[in-house]
Amino acid sequence: MENVNRIVAEGIAAVEAAQDFNALEQIKARYLGKTGELTGLLKTLGQMSPEERKTIGAHINECKNRFQTAFNAKREALNEVKLQARLAAEALDITLPGRAQEGGSLHPVTLTLQRVVELFHGMGFEVADGPEIEDDFHNFQALNIPANHPARAMQDTFYVENGDVLRTHTSPIQIRYMLDKKEPPIRIIAPGRVYRVDSDATHSPMFHQAEGLWVEEGVTFADLKAVFTDFIRRFFERDDLQVRFRPSFFPFTEPSAEIDIMGENGKWLEVGGCGMVHPNVLKNVNIDPEKYTGFAFGIGLDRFAMLRYNVNDLRLFFDNDLNFLKQFAK
């Protein structure tokens, strides 16, 4: 029995001295494995008398239990050390100041839209809105665009399954507003997203427009020129900005014009289209063209943003590059 006590004492001492799980498992194998020292003692019981086998066998089993208890305790201790080390590594210093959330900012196109609306609001225009998916009547027919007009072609317009379209301009907002209001005077600015099959450095399949409309008795082309010239000079903050109105054609206005401004390079730059509302358009919204006249104009807000912020590629606005967009934060 003295030999058994010595072996188990040495085993327990080795267990308590183990520094890691690998060493602990090796000690267990040395004493309780198939060829372990305590296991080997049990194999000698067959050589003993029944009385000795009973007494010594019970003692060996007791020693094995003591060893296993010491082993379990050491394993728990090593687990606790491992846990504490991990917690220490992951500990948060709650005395450190927090990181401030970086504030967002408005998109440059949104800033441009707001500036346009602000300027026209100051001239008595109210903001109107409408759906981005339009039917044929509001997007084409009511605006004096016949069935064979090139603007209806598949290569220019996004059609949906039921024949409706993604609006190609914000003019349908004007139609809906006039039909709803019934009677002039009407003075609105209609900003929003529009869609056309086009994509390059200065065009996008989705872009932003703002269209203005003024319908009232006695409105003339001179009023159109005065209003738009005042707006464009205020927008670019240049009282001496040269503006010209160049004859053009649109099915929904007559007469029609393209609007140009003088660029810093000394060349004319197109910034919009305009004209007197076509009598057929007024008839389509139940307004008497013999009594009322009106003008309409349209500008590309993305184009205005490019000019305002000196950006030469429209696609940069929609690449979601935060480093680029942060330049325009206010």
Swiss-Prot record:
It catalyses: tRNA(Phe) + L-phenylalanine + ATP = L-phenylalanyl-tRNA(Phe) + AMP + diphosphate + H(+). Keywords: Aminoacyl-tRNA synthetase, ATP-binding, Cytoplasm, Ligase, Magnesium, Metal-binding, Nucleotide-binding, Protein biosynthesis. Signal peptide: none annotated. CDD domains: PheRS_alpha_core. GO terms for molecular function: ATP binding; magnesium ion binding; phenylalanine-tRNA ligase activity; tRNA binding. It is found in: Cytoplasm. The keyword Transferase does not apply. InterPro entries: aa-tRNA-synth_II (IPR006195), aa-tRNA-synth_II/BPL/LPL (IPR045864), Phe-tRNA-synth_IIc_asu (IPR004529), Phe-tRNA_ligase_II_N (IPR004188), Phe_tRNA_ligase_alpha1_bac (IPR022911), Phenylalanyl-tRNA_Synthase (IPR002319), tRNA-bd_arm (IPR010978). Transmembrane segments: none annotated. One of its GO terms (cellular component) is cytoplasm. One of its GO terms (biological process) is phenylalanyl-tRNA aminoacylation. Its EC number is 6.1.1.20. Mg(2+) binds at E254. Its main location: cytoplasm. Its cofactor is Mg(2+). Binds 2 magnesium ions per tetramer. PANTHER family: PHENYLALANINE--TRNA LIGASE, MITOCHONDRIAL, PHENYLALANYL-TRNA SYNTHETASE. Belongs to the class-II aminoacyl-tRNA synthetase family. Phe-tRNA synthetase alpha subunit type 1 subfamily. Tetramer of two alpha and two beta subunits. HAMAP family: Phe_tRNA_synth_alpha1. This is Phenylalanine--tRNA ligase alpha subunit.
